[in-house]
C-alpha cells in the first residue's frame, strides 16, 4: 500500500507542481520507500511508495510504453497473475501487481475495477482523451478522498488522506467504496453491485459451514502475497485468532512447497497461481503481535493462541499515559473524531510503530467479521432476523468510515500495511447471503454471537482435522478491541475528558458544529482536537460517528460492556 495525490486539469500545472509535492509529503508516512511524480498535459500524479510486491520495478506513477497512460495506485491486486495472462497483448513495464489496471482500462474502460480482486484506490489518466478515471475497492479498505476548489472549479483533486486536500479544496468527500469516477461525465457511479447490497432483500440460503471455512482460508491465502516479512495482529479474540491460525498453516504450507520445488523461478511473481498455490516471501514461521495494558484480557488470550498455532509471538504493553499522550497524533492520522474509532485506534497506532521497528511491512487483521456476522453484542437486541440483516448490511456499507478507516490509517501512519481477509469479495458474497436466522444471537439456545463462524472452524466432529484454535478461544465472548486491551483504557479516557471539558464548555458547543453535537465530554474533547487539526467544515463532513442502534434499546456508548449480555455488563 502507498499514498497517492492527483490534480486533474489544473490551470497552471507546472507552477503548481512544487505545491503538489508539498501536499503529497504530508502522507509520506504511508510510503517511506520512494517518492515519484509525473505530469501529463494539465494533470499531475504524485506517489509515496511502500514496497511490498515488485520491489525492484514497481515504482509509481506507472506510465504505459507508448507514454499515453499514467497510473497511480494505493493498494494490492491479489489476482494480478491471472490479469497479466488475460492482458498478454499489453507490453508490461514493471512487475507491479497494479500495472494490469492499464490494459484492463484499455479493454473495459470504466468497468475495469470490476475485474480487480484486491484492496485499492487508483487514478488513471488517459492523455489522448484528457480524461481521469478514479476508483475505490468494493468495501473501502483503502482510503481515498476527492476534492474541488471554488477558485478553480474545473480542477479535481484526489488523495489517500484528507490532510492533503484541506489547503487547496473547499469541498471534500470521502470517495464512496465500490464506485468509479469518470471526468468525461463528471459522475461517480457504482461498479460493485452484488445482490446483498439491497438491505431490503432478506436472504434465505442455509448455512454451509465447510464453505465458510474454505472461503476464509482462500481469502487469507490470497493476502499472504508479499516479497517482504509479514505478520498478523493477534488480539486473542475470535476474529484475529482465526486469521492467525489460518495464516500460520498457509505460511507453513507455502514454505514446504517452496522447499520441495527444486526448480523455483527467482522471477516468480508473488501471489496465487492458477492452481491456487501461494508464492510468497518472508519468515519461515508466522510472527504474531499483540498489545494491551498490563494484564489485559487480550494479552492473556493472545498468548494462548500463539502457543497453540506455533507463531513467534511479540507482546507489547502500553500505559494509560502513553495512550493519552498519543491522542493528538492519532486524531491527526485518523482524521476523525468518532469515539469508538479513536478508542480502538490508539493501541493499534502504538502497536504498528513497534511492528514496523521490527522490520515488518505487512500484517493481516480481523476487521469486518462483526459486521458480516452481527458480532457486536448489541445485535442480541435485534427485534427480528430481517432487522438483524438490515443492520448488518448497513454496517458493512459504512466500514470505510469506521473499522476500515482505523485499520488503514493507524497502521499506515508508520508505513505498515494491514490486509483484511474477512472483507474478501467472495467471502462476502457467501456470508452476506446466509439466512440471518442462522446468525442471530440466541443465548437460550446456546447460540452466542458469530455462532456460525465459530461452528465452521469447530473440528470436534472431525478427528482427522487438526484443531484451529483452543476451545476456550473459539468460543470466547466478543470484546471490543478498545475493551480487550484493558478495561481501564476506556475508563481512563473518560476520566481525563471529564477533567479537560468543563460543564460550561459542554453546555455551549460551537455554533459551527450545527446538529452534530457531542453527547459526552469524551466526544466533545475529541472534536476539539479534530478541529485543531482540521478546522474546515468540509473536513468534519467526512466523519461518521459509530453508535449502536438506539431504537433497539441499546446504550449510546459503543463499549461492549454496555451490552446487556456482556459477562461484565455495566449500566450506562
From Swiss-Prot:
Pathway: Amino-acid biosynthesis; L-asparagine biosynthesis; L-asparagine from L-aspartate (L-Gln route): step 1/1. Keywords: Amino-acid biosynthesis, Asparagine biosynthesis, ATP-binding, Glutamine amidotransferase, Ligase, Nucleotide-binding. GO terms for biological process: asparagine biosynthetic process; L-asparagine biosynthetic process. Residues 194-545 form the Asparagine synthetase domain. GO terms for cellular component: cytoplasm; cytosol. It catalyses: L-aspartate + L-glutamine + ATP + H2O = L-asparagine + L-glutamate + AMP + diphosphate + H(+). The record marks 367 as: Important for beta-aspartyl-AMP intermediate formation. The keyword Transmembrane does not apply. Residues 2-186 form the Glutamine amidotransferase type-2 domain. L-glutamine binds at residues 49-53, 74-76, 97. Its EC number is 6.3.5.4. Present with 58200 molecules/cell in log phase SD medium. NCBIfam families: asn_synth_AEB, PRK09431.1. This is Asparagine synthetase [glutamine-hydrolyzing] 2. It comes from Saccharomyces cerevisiae (strain ATCC 204508 / S288c).
Amino acid at each position: 500500500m502507498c499514498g497517492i495525490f492527483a490534480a486533474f486539469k489544473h490551470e497552471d500545472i507546472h507552477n503548481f507542481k512544487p505545491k503538489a509535492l508539498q501536499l503529497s509529503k504530508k502522507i509520506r508516512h504511508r510510503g517511506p520507500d520512494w517518492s515519484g511524480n509525473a505530469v501529463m498535459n494539465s494533470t499531475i500524479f504524485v506517489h509515496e511508495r511502500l514496497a511490498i510486491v515488485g520491489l525492484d520495478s514497481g515504482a509509481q506513477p506507472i506510465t504505459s510504453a507508448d507514454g499515453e497512460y499514467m497510473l497511480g495506485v494505493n493498494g494490492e491486486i491479489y489476482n494480478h497473475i491471472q490479469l497479466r495472462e488475460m492482458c498478454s497483448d499489453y507490453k508490461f513495464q514493471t512487475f507491479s501487481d497494479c500495472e494490469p489496471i492499464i490494459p484492463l482500462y484499455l479493454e473495459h474502460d470504466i468497468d475495469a475495477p470490476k475485474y480487480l480482486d484486491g484492496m485499492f484506490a487508483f487514478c488513471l489518466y488517459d492523455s489522448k482523451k484528457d480524461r481521469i478515471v478514479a476508483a475505490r475497492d468494493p468495501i473501502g479498505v483503502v482510503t481515498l478522498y476527492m476534492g474541488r476548489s471554488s477558485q478553480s472549479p474545473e480542477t479535481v483533486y484526489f488523495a489517500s488522506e484528507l490532510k492533503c486536500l484541506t489547503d487547496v479544496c473547499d469541498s471534500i468527500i470521502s470517495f464512496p467504496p465500490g464506485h468509479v469516477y469518470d471526468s468525461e461525465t463528471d459522475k461517480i457511479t457504482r461498479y460493485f453491485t452484488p445482490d446483498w447490497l439491497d438491505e431490503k432483500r432478506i436472504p434465505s440460503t442455509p448455512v454451509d459451514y465447510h464453505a465458510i471455512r474454505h472461503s476464509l482460508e482462500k481469502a487469507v491465502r490470497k493476502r499472504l502475497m508479499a516479497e517482504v516479512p509479514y505478520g498478523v495482529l493477534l488480539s486473542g479474540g475470535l476474529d484475529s485468532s482465526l486469521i492467525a491460525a489460518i495464516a500460520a498453516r498457509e505460511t507453513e504450507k507455502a514454505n514446504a512447497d517452496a522447499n520441495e520445488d527444486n526448480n523455483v523461478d527467482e522471477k516468480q511473481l508473488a501471489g496465487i497461481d492458477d492452481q491456487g498455490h501461494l508464492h510468497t516471501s518472508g519468515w519461515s514461521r508466522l510472527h504474531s503481535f499483540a498489545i494491551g495494558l498490563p494484564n489485559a484480557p487480550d494479552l492473556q488470550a493472545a498468548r494462548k493462541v500463539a502457543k497453540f498455532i506455533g507463531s513467534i509471538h511479540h507482546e507489547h504493553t502500553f500505559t494509560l499515559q502513553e495512550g493519552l499522550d498519543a491522542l493528538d497524533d492519532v486524531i491527526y492520522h485518523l482524521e476523525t473524531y468518532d469515539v469508538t474509532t479513536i478508542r480502538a485506534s490508539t493501541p493499534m497506532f502504538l502497536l504498528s510503530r513497534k511492528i514496523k521497528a521490527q522490520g515488518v511491512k505487512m500484517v493481516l487483521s480481523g476487521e469486518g467479521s462483526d459486521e458480516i456476522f452481527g458480532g457486536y453484542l448489541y445485535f442480541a437486541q435485534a427485534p427480528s432476523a430481517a432487522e438483524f440483516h438490515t443492520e448488518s448490511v448497513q454496517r458493512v456499507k459504512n466500514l470505510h468510515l469506521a473499522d476500515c478507516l482505523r485499520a488503514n490509517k493507524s497502521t499506515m501512519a508508520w508505513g505498515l500495511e494491514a490486509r483484511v481477509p474477512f472483507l474478501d469479495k467472495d467471502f462476502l458474497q457467501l456470508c452476506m447471503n446466509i439466512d440471518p436466522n442462522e446468525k442471530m444471537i440466541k443465548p437460550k439456545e446456546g447460540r452466542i454471537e458469530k455462532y456460525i463462524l465459530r461452528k465452521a472452524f469447530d473440528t470436534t466432529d472431525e478427528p482427522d482435522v487438526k484443531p484451529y484454535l483452543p476451545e476456550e478461544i473459539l468460543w470466547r465472548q466478543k470484546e471490543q478491541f478498545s475493551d480487550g486491551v484493558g478495561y481501564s483504557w476506556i475508563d481512563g479516557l473518560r476520566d481525563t475528558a471529564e477533567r479537560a471539558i468543563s460543564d460550561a464548555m459542554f453546555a455551549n458547543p460551537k455554533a459551527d458544529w450545527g446538529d452534530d453535537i457531542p453527547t459526552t465530554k469524551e466526544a466533545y474533547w475529541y472534536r476539539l482536537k479534530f478541529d485543531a487539526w482540521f478546522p474546515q467544515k468540509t473536513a468534519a463532513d467526512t466523519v461518521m460517528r459509530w453508535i449502536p442502534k438506539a431504537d433497539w434499546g441499546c446504550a449510546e456508548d459503543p463499549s461492549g460492556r454496555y451490552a446487556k449480555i456482556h459477562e461484565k455488563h455495566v449500566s450506562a
